[in-house]
Amino acid sequence: MATTSLAQPAIQSQIDTPTPLRLWHLTSLWHLTSLDAPTVAVTWTLAFAWAAQIHLPLWLPITLALAAWSAYIADRLLDAHRAYLSPTGVADTCSLIPDPCSLSLRPRHHFHWKHRRVFIPLAFAAGLAALSLVLVNMPLAARERNSVLAAAALVYFTSVHNPWRLATPKLSLRLPKELLVALIFTLACAIPTLSRISPRIPARRPELLIPTLAFIALAWLNCQAIETWESATPSRNLIFPLAATLTAVTALIATIFLAGHQALIAALLATAATSAALLALLNRHRHRVTPTTLRAAADLVLLTPLVLLIMPAFTQ
């Protein structure tokens, strides 16, 4: 997910030895091709709509997926470009030993750089397709409303990849990047549903704000876990207690909603609690899998709301 895919690279370069299980081959490829973020984005968007009993137009999740894919590809290519840039200002594509800062890249960055001739046109095509869908299908009022979130995402993205950011540390964003990514990503998934809630809809906007906050916390936990696991100088690992706390609190709130006959909201919260518990489990067993598999699994566990989408909707 959502995820710290927009964060800076920080650990050693290595391409993991493929695991013998085909499932993990596919999962790793899903991550390496940056398809993890758009998959999570679409799943969460449809899950919020499911909980509110709202049918979103097909173009909307497609647009979100294309925009997320384009942004994450661009982020990883820009990270790789900066790391591989030679002192002369030209990417050193022929050298068997890349620029020293490229040694901090992760497998996903190397994969994107190696296949940049494919990813660059794909990113442009996905971005243009998303923009076209917005211009053709989104009402003007909705565009104005969503422009605030789009501007926030653009400001964050440019601040991360601003080549002069190290020279102006006082101008850097003070809010932790993991929280910023979590806020932008989750709100992009929730706003299509929140903006369509009316008095005739069983799930009122305040009620859906609770799971929105829960998923923001889940996205932050995912980003924080990835940052902790991939950091070259990790601080104290607090992922397990944080995940356990989020699991317990979210499960308790889900129980309260269920007791109040809000079964759909409760089910959505239950999937968030399950994802948090799975992140805690991943943290406990993180040393048993390769870094790429661990990184892919961190986003894979965010897909628990898929259970809601494949089961028949039930009424409250």
Give the location of each predicted region.
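Transmembrane alpha-helical segments that form the membrane-embedded catalytic/substrate-channel core
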Residues: 66-81, 151-164, 187, 216-231, ...
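Transmembrane helix-loop-helix
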Residues: 116-162, 244-291
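Short polybasic linear motifs
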Residues: 14-19, 87, 94-103
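Juxtamembrane boundary at the C-terminal end of a transmembrane helix
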Residues: 307-316
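Interhelical loop and helix-boundary elements at the membrane-water interface
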Residues: 20-39, 80-89, 105-124, 141, ...
